[in-house]
Amino acid sequence: MTTNAAPTKRSILLINGPNLNLLGTREPEKYGSETLSDIEENARRQCNELGFDFEGFQSNHEGVIVDRIHAARTDGTTAIIINAGAYTHTSVAIRDALTGVRVPFIEVHISNIHAREPFRHHSYLSDVAQGVIVGLGTLGYTAAIWSVVEKLKQGGFS
């Protein structure tokens, strides 16, 4: 029996939180010289080469990030990669949104949050994330995309 069903679309959503819109000019000694646009363009290219759609999203507002995570539940998002910025250390709301939508996610940080100020050492996301990548600079985004694709090839996240 032949079906005409469309293939399932695979899509990666990259969420960046507060102040990450300033990448390239904000503390380049910690975050490097790449802009958010550079990161998103590299991620889009990598996703497309691997057969995935890509959406980049950035907001400085916690509720807007929560709303975008909620939308991922029904918009075809296969996986989320999130750098929640400072909200990593403060936002139970973002944690609850991520666990509530049941879309697998990987937490990424450009700098090593464990080698910085003590208040940055705790993440509200790490213990519910499928993976955490810190301290690799913007290469962490590339590693996260590769990890998502490889996990899905192996049958998905458990």
Swiss-Prot record:
Annotated pathway = Aromatic compound metabolism; 3,4-dihydroxybenzoate biosynthesis; 3,4-dihydroxybenzoate from 3-dehydroquinate: step 1/2
In chain numbering, where does the site feature Transition state stabilizer fall? Answer: 26
Q: Report the leader peptide range.
A: none
What are the catalytic residues? 31, 109
Residue positions annotated to bind substrate are: 83, 89, 96, 110-111, 120
Q: Could you say which EC number(s) this protein's record lists? A: 4.2.1.10
What's in the keyword line of the UniProt record?
Lyase, Quinate metabolism
Q: Which GO terms describe its molecular function?
A: 3-dehydroquinate dehydratase activity
Question: Is Lyase one of the keywords UniProt gives this record?
Answer: yes
Q: What is this enzyme's catalytic activity, as reactions?
A: 3-dehydroquinate = 3-dehydroshikimate + H2O
GO BP? 3,4-dihydroxybenzoate biosynthetic process; quinate catabolic process
What PROSITE patterns does the database record attribute to this sequence?
Answer: DEHYDROQUINASE_II
Subunit relationships: Homododecamer. Adopts a ring-like structure, composed of an arrangement of two hexameric rings stacked on top of one another.
What is the similarity comment for this entry? Belongs to the type-II 3-dehydroquinase family.
- Tell me the HAMAP family matching this sequence: AroQ
Q: What is this protein called?
A: Catabolic 3-dehydroquinase
Q: Which organism is it from?
A: Mycosarcoma maydis (Corn smut fungus)
